[in-house]
Amino acid sequence: MSHFKFYSAVVLTANGKKNILLHDIKSPSIEKVNEDIFHVVSSCGSPCVGHYFIGKHEEDYTEELISFDIKSKCIIESDSRKKKIYAKKMFTNNKRILIDLSEKKFNILPSKFNYYSDFSEMSHFDNTGELNLIANDYGKILFKKKIQNPCGSNSK
């Protein structure tokens, strides 16, 4: 039996020029999040997911996306190997540690190899830009914390 696989390329056309940004993306999902930025999601199998944020002149990538706020261009991501949750401004590499998952209180989390999966389902930014960081296991809340302005100032 053959399995249907869908591959495509992401092409940016700006100022009359075509630029292929991503080749052979497997089963992409593309969402326009504002006038200038697209969010492209590509799965390579559980738990492997790639998240690309593509603007007219810049792009950003993360494998462990928890949440993002397009108004402040703030990305919340985890690094499961380093056991950290970071905030960073989109299109920069300046990361700010929000949570150290190696602290004993986080031993309750079920995931040990992909922490983002514990946080990504319920974590969100509210309409004031405050991050509600929530870890859950099948609907049971294991950890909850509100973080104001997780990426720092609103300037880029």
Task: Give each language-model segment a name.
Residues S2-L22, G45-L65, Y86-K112, Y138-K156:
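Surface-exposed loop/turn elements that mediate protein-protein interactions on large endomembrane-trafficking
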Residues M1-K5, N34-G45, K71-K88, D118-D137, ...:
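Short beta-strand elements that form the blades of beta-propeller/WD-repeat-like
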Residues L22-E31, T62-D79, N107-S123:
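Repeated scaffold domains used in trafficking and secretory/extracellular systems
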Residues L22-G50:
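Beta-propeller folds
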